[in-house]
């Protein structure tokens, strides 16, 4: 079984002006919830078990997706109050288990990553965290990372400010052993990017990244949400 945790518990406040009364992953794109497009892609890549970490208006997600989506098993963990991306990971990891790696996905990001290639790279280097990276062309929009030629993450925040740098694409192949020493527990509110990654880096956990050139879009801002309706690939949406 190949499992993925989808971080879908955010409030989506930046998108509220154009998508009201819906959790962000349920925002309609080409007549269907964005979450369906996300699940379709990763099912195509071989994922057959999803855990959705949900919070704001979670009933709408659970009622729509259910416990089985196109043959993939769907489970849920519910954030009774917003826990942040790190808190969602801690909660979801309990459901999946601590003995084998799994995929971690941002619920508002579509990034066409080759899962087989991501896993192979992680296995070769025995990573705790394997990041999927993309080339950010918008200066100042995405925080770049300093990466060695071998893929080792030397810094979580790049000192380079111009476009064309490698940035975090919000898709990770992750081994839950990495959580044992970081100092956060299930139920804690924390950020994956600011808290958990920072702690993992300080502990010298194996953090590496590999670049992918597949389609990338983050629907967190109204401008990009409108763009998604035109650009999200359709080959996995039927």
Segments predicted by a language model, with ranges:
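Catalytic-core segments of class I nucleotidyltransferases/pyrophosphorylases
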Residues: 103, 110, 116-123, 137, ...
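Conserved beta-strand termini and adjacent loop/short-helix elements that scaffold enzyme active sites
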Residues: 55, 77-79, 132, 156, ...
């Amino acid at each position: 079984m190949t499992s993925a945790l989808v971080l879908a518990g955010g409030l989506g406040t930046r998108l509220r002006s154009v998508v009201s009364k819906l959790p962000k992953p349920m925002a309609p794109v080409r007549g269907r919830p964005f979450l369906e497009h996300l699940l379709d892609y990763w099912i195509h890549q071989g994922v057959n078990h999803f855990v959705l970490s949900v919070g704001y208006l979670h009933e709408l997600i659970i009622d729509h997706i259910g416990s089985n989506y196109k043959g993939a098993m769907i489970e849920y963990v519910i954030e009774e109050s917003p826990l942040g991306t790190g808190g969602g990971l801690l909660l979801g990891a309990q459901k999946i288990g601590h003995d084998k790696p799994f995929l971690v996905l941002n619920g508002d990001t579509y990034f066409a990553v080759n899962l087989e290639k991501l896993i192979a790279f992680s296995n070769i280097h025995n990573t705790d965290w394997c990041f999927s990276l993309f080339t950010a062309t918008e200066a100042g929009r995405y925080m770049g990372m300093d990466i060695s030629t071998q893929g080792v993450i030397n810094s979580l925040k790049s000192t380079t400010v111009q476009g064309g740098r490698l940035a975090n694409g919000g898709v990770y192949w992750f081994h839950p052993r990495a959580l044992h020493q970081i100092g956060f527990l299930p139920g804690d509110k924390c950020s994956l990017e600011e808290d958990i990654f920072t702690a993992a880096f300080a502990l010298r956990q194996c953090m590496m990244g590999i670049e992918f050139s597949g389609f990338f879009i983050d629907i967190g801002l109204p401008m990009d949400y409108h763009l998604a309706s035109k650009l999200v690939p359709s080959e996995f949406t039927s």
